[in-house]
UniProtKB/Swiss-Prot annotation:
GO biological process, one term: transcription initiation at RNA polymerase II promoter
GO molecular function: DNA binding
Chain's gene name: tfe
Purpose of the protein: Transcription factor that plays a role in the activation of archaeal genes transcribed by RNA polymerase. Facilitates transcription initiation by enhancing TATA-box recognition by TATA-box-binding protein (Tbp), and transcription factor B (Tfb) and RNA polymerase recruitment. Not absolutely required for transcription in vitro, but particularly important in cases where Tbp or Tfb function is not optimal. It dynamically alters the nucleic acid-binding properties of RNA polymerases by stabilizing the initiation complex and destabilizing elongation complexes.
Species annotation: Pyrococcus horikoshii (strain ATCC 700860 / DSM 12428 / JCM 9974 / NBRC 100139 / OT-3)
Stated name of the protein: Transcription factor E
Leader sequence segment: none
Length: 191
């Protein structure tokens, strides 16, 4: 499966879950289909298929052509996947993710958090912990300052990766191993 196809399915899953993924796969395989045909192929209810198709259309990932049946006067909509704008859509989604991560980093670095140690319980800001007398409101354990340095480093790493992917930051330069050793060997010869 190509990276582009994986990204399309990922976006589809975000839009309409596993059912959207099935519809996208069916459309890719068939090329073009009506909502009724897709319902038959995937086993998903027609109303759900339509809802997902409209969501994909709104996201500019699907389009249709309308054909009028001259005998009945009814219109049939033949849907297909539209990938021309996929790179633009992926970039926009990555930009949104980047903004979200930067906001999270801002929150993590500007606030001191407290936690009881139970991973199922929330971490609290200083003000919240103070309000509860530095006692966990769920289990009653004493709240200790939460070391979020690993979270901060992970956020910084992901932000850097996204900025490099988006071309907003140059990738880190790798040092060449041979250059330093030549300089050292010249200095050692002079002695």
């Amino acid at each position: 499966m190509s990276k582009r196809n994986k990204e399309l399915l990922e976006i589809g899953r975000d839009i309409g879950g596993d059912e959207a993924v099935e519809i996208i796969k069916a459309l890719e395989k068939k090329g073009e289909a009506t909502d009724e045909e897709l319902a038959e192929i995937t086993g998903i209810r027609v109303n759900t298929v339509r809802k997902i198709l409209y969501a994909l259309y709104d996201a500019k990932l699907a389009d249709f052509r309308r054909v009028k049946d001259d005998e009945t006067g009814w219109y049939y909509y033949y849907w297909h996947i539209e990938t021309k704008r996929l790179p633009e859509i992926i970039r926009a989604r990555k930009m949104q993710e980047l903004e979200k991560l930067k906001k999270m980093l801002q929150e993590e670095t500007s606030e001191v958090y407290y936690h009881c140690g139970n991973p199922d319980h929330p971490k609290l800001t200083f003000d919240e912990a103070f309000e509860y007398g530095f006692v966990c409101p769920i289990c009653g354990e004493i709240l200790h300052q939460y070391d979020n340095s690993a979270v901060i480093e992970e956020l910084k790493k992901r932000i850097e990766e996204l900025e490099i992917e988006l071309g907003l930051r140059a990738p880190p330069k790798k040092e060449k191993k041979g250059k330093k050793s030549k300089k050292r060997s010249k200095k050692s010869k002079k002695k």
